[in-house]
Design a protein with these regions (language model features):
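N-terminal secretory/targeting leader peptides
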Residues: 2-122, 132, 141-334
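A gly/proline- and charged-residue-enriched helix-loop-helix capping module
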Residues: 124-128
Length: 334
């Protein structure tokens, strides 16, 4: 019960003593669930949206239906940047946003966007599900956000119009990247030229030879049809950038006032829904890769010697994070 509800009840007490029948509306009001909003910018059938629904179901179960979470998918409540701002002021209760958006507010989070940071997905989850991941989530407190759990957003690789088998073949190519200084710096470090192209126009840019290639994960490569115009896939797996499930501080306070156990219930539900999202994403990613290989896409996988060349090429980017070298070492030794 919130302080406001308690004051209302105390104020109404004398009247209730005289007319007992007046107690019924108050009792009914207490039984109404707390309605909360979850913002998701992906469509309903996307892994993150399905995980959001799983989170909502878990919350209802674990709170005995005292808390109901409504999921708004398809960016119905706004784009990610807008959602972050709404959460900071309590306008949205929960969401899932990309790490790159959060790094705009907290530069230290950019460490997690460094290329070739992890050897594989298992290492990334050891880091993020451990004490290091908790440290990064705690950084969000200073942004008036509460970090709940880590979602998977896949691993990104290059794909091109002409065959690329290693670092030498990338030299001088024009590669479309996200609007991110980190991504542009990576392309330059690898000897190519970064290009900013609206995502929906990448297919046309590849088709018209305005760019030589792009980079993304397997599902996006398949869904956007980029394999039709860039059939050479260089599986270098340069970045594994997670996404974050968030709560607003205001809603966590509201939940604590309703029941002191509810904030931890929310955190537990978030962790469970994150596992659901990762499983859904892994299946989606594996299916997309399998489909592409069946279509005859030329896939080049790097041997250890060539991987070492790629890592050496981006070392200047790591040098810029010398102040966080100890943290980087902890990540790479996990």
């Amino acid at each position: 019960m919130t302080r406001r509800q308690l004051l209302r009840l105390l104020t109404a007490a004398p009247a209730l003593a005289v007319t007992g029948c007046a107690a019924q509306p108050a009792s009914s009001q207490q039984e109404k669930p707390l309605i909360l909003r979850y913002a998701e910018n992906q469509p309903e059938d996307y892994p993150t949206s399905k995980a959001a629904k799983a989170f909502a179901e878990l919350v209802a179960q674990r709170t005995n239906n005292k808390v109901k979470v409504l999921v708004y998918s398809g960016a119905e409540l706004g784009a990610e940047q807008s959602i972050i701002q709404q959460m900071q002021f309590g306008g949205v209760d929960f969401s899932r946003v990309s790490l790159s958006q959060l790094a705009e507010y907290e530069p230290e989070l950019s460490v997690l966007q460094l290329p070739y940071l992890y050897s594989d997905a298992q290492q990334m989850w050891r880091v993020l599900d451990g004490s290091i991941g908790d440290e990064f989530l705690a950084m969000l407190d200073g942004m008036d956000l509460v970090g709940l759990s880590w979602f998977d957003a896949g691993v990104r690789s290059f794909y091109t119009r002409e065959k690329v088998t290693g670092l030498d073949d990338l030299q001088g190519l024009t590669i479309r990247v996200q609007e991110s200084d980190m991504m542009s710096d990576m392309i330059i470090a690898l000897g190519a030229k970064p290009a900013q192209v609206v995502y929906s126009k990448v297919y046309a840019a590849l088709h018209n030879a305005e760019i030589d290639g792009a980079e993304n994960n397997w599902p996006s490569y398949e869904v956007m049809g980029h394999y039709e115009v860039a059939p050479f896939f260089l599986k270098d797996e340069h970045t594994r950038v997670p996404e974050v499930q968030l709560a607003s501080p205001a809603v966590m306070e509201k939940l604590a006032a309703l029941d002191e156990s509810f904030p931890e219930v929310i955190r537990a539900c978030a962790r469970e829904s994150a596992q659901t999202e990762r499983e859904l994403w892994a299946r989606r990613e594996a299916n997309a890769e399998q489909n592409m290989r069946k279509r005859g896409i030329c896939v080049t996988e790097l041997d250890e010697a060539e991987k070492a060349r790629f890592r050496a090429a981006v070392q200047p980017m790591y040098d810029e994070f010398s102040a966080q070298q100890e943290l980087i070492d902890r990540i790479q030794k996990s």
